[in-house]
Amino acid sequence: NPYAHYTTTGPEIWQQTGGRISHFVSSMGTTGTITGVSRFLREQAKPVSIIGLQPEEGSSIPGIRRWPAEYMPGIFNASLVDQVLDIHQRDAENTMRALAVREGIFCGVSSGGAVAGAIRVANENPGAVVVAIICDRGDRYLSTGVFGEESYAQGAGI
């Protein structure tokens, strides 16, 4: 997984941004994406801030884990990550729904978390070129109620 992101995702991000990327924001599930992409970006001439995302204490975001240090996956290299942000489940879900309604991107909760984190980083760094990856699909969450009547009744559904 890290090798695939090192050889494909990292170079694609570099190419698509014309090397202008200043911040890479990635959810930390298996940590393959953040490990592979950050390794590639660190090898480029320009410094890029690498930011990992984990659920806030007490939040549950499918696909993103709050790893205790002793249980971090063996592929993870902490020296490649500059900062770890906590994301609240509500923010991840709200961003996921906003992406569906405003942008037509039907993604899942972990992608909502990644984009919520990227928006936070962009707001704190005007003019920055911030990249996040949409890493899951919304159809996997249809039965959970995050898009449905329960959420809508609480003012959050679409």
List the model feature ranges, each with a label.
Residues 7-14, 35-38, 42, 61-65, ...:
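Predominant activation on well-ordered alpha-helical scaffold segments within soluble catalytic domains
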Residues 3, 27-38, 110-118, 141:
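Short glycine/serine/threonine-rich phosphate/pyrophosphate-binding segments
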Residues 29-32, 54-59, 68, 113, ...:
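Glycine-rich beta-alpha junction loops
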Residues 106-109, 129-134:
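Conserved active-site loop/cleft motifs that coordinate metal ions or position small ligands
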